[in-house]
Swiss-Prot record:
GO biological process: aerobic respiration; inorganic anion transport; regulation of cellular response to oxidative stress
Annotated family: Belongs to the mitochondrial carrier (TC 2.A.29) family.
Name of the protein in its database record: Brain mitochondrial carrier protein 1
A cellular-component GO term for this protein: mitochondrial inner membrane
Length: 325
């Protein structure tokens, strides 16, 4: 759990630095002050709302990705059977055997996760960018990647308990029993705090990769399309930029995502040794026992989720910005 002190320190530094910039902005000009104060809360609110909308719209695809990733574990008898041949086969079989509502198993903790993770992720990312540069035109890929990595690690670590519950509900489907709050309590009583933050390291690593790739790729693609004169600041530009960043994020994150999913699905049992002790250990074991392409299990549903998810998210986010709610 040594990751927390460093993350908390980074978070506090960001908060103090943001406060310092806001004070400085007040001293320089009223315009800059207004802009910085807006960045204090609007990206947080817009990011959270857009994340919830995108999560609900793409959740069935995310569930099939989880089922595909946890199956075929030769060293875990519970998930040794290969039940699903692909994304569409998984969708039809889940509907047939468990009912249509099973496609939304784990939706409650998923929405709760996005309300926290999505809110913090976008808010910190946008605030950090303004600490480095004041104008959008001055942003660079490197600056945006650094901001994305930091915001991804902080937000995913805070939201990890909701992710653990979502993964378990998705993997076990109709076999999972209990309410969301009751399940949180049950995990805490049986596995302790470590159970709620099980898989936090690969989760933070995946978030660092996904956010560190997706948000900068979106910003740079959008900036290039607009400044080059190819497109204006329109929904089509937002669509192309979000589609591109979704593909880039899926390619970069899938191996870590598979390991993260399996680690979170592990239960703490007396006398039982965890199959995967960490990200590197998980990748090496999967490669050894299941082959290299096991690291890209669930890639198509992962991409087909990240693509539409990012499209829905960024279009919703951009429209909320224009509405100036």
């Amino acid at each position: 759990m040594g990751i927390f002190p460093g993350i908390i320190l980074i978070f506090l530094r960001v908060k103090f630095a943001t406060a310092a910039v806001i004070v400085s902005g007040h001293q320089k000009s009223t315009t800059v002050s207004h802009e910085m104060s807006g960045l204090n809360w609007k990206p947080f609110v817009y990011g959270g709302l857009a994340s919830i909308v995108a999560e609900f719209g793409t959740f069935p695809v995310d569930l099939t990705k989880t089922r595909l990733q946890v199956q075929g574990q030769s060293i875990d008898a519970r998930f040794k059977e290969i039940k699903y041949r692909g994304m569409f086969h998984a969708l039809f079989r889940i509907c047939k055997e468990e009912g249509v509502l099973a496609l939304y198993s784990g939706i409650a903790p998923a929405l709760l996760r996005q309300a926290s993770y999505g809110t913090i992720k976008i808010g910190i990312y946008q605030s950090l960018k303004r600490l480095f540069v004041e104008r959008l035109e001055d942003e660079t890929l490197l600056i945006n990647m650094i901001c994305g990595v930091v915001s991804g690690v902080i937000s995913s670590t805070i939201a990890n308990p909701t992710d653990v519950l979502k993964i378990r509900m998705q993997a076990q489907g109709s076999l999972f029993q209990g309410s969301m709050i009751g399940s949180f309590i049950d995990i805490y009583q049986q596995e302790g705090t470590r159970g709620l933050w099980r898989g936090v390291v690969p989760t933070a690593q995946r978030a660092a990769i996904v956010v560190g790739v997706e948000l900068p790729v979106y910003d740079i693609t959008k900036k290039h399309l607009i400044l080059s004169g190819m497109m204006g600041d329109t929904i089509l530009t937002h669509f192309v930029s979000s589609f591109t960043c979704g593909l880039a994020g899926a390619l970069a994150s899938n191996p870590v995502d598979v390991v993260r999913t399996r680690m979170m699905n592990q239960r703490a049992i007396v006398g039982h040794v965890d199959l995967y002790k960490g990200t590197v250990d998980g990748i090496l074991k999967m490669w050894k026992h299941e082959g290299f392409f096991a690291l890209y299990k669930g890639f198509w549903p992962n991409w087909l989720r990240l693509g539409p998810w990012n499209i829905i998210f960024f279009i919703t986010y951009e429209q909320l910005k224009r509405l100036q709610i």
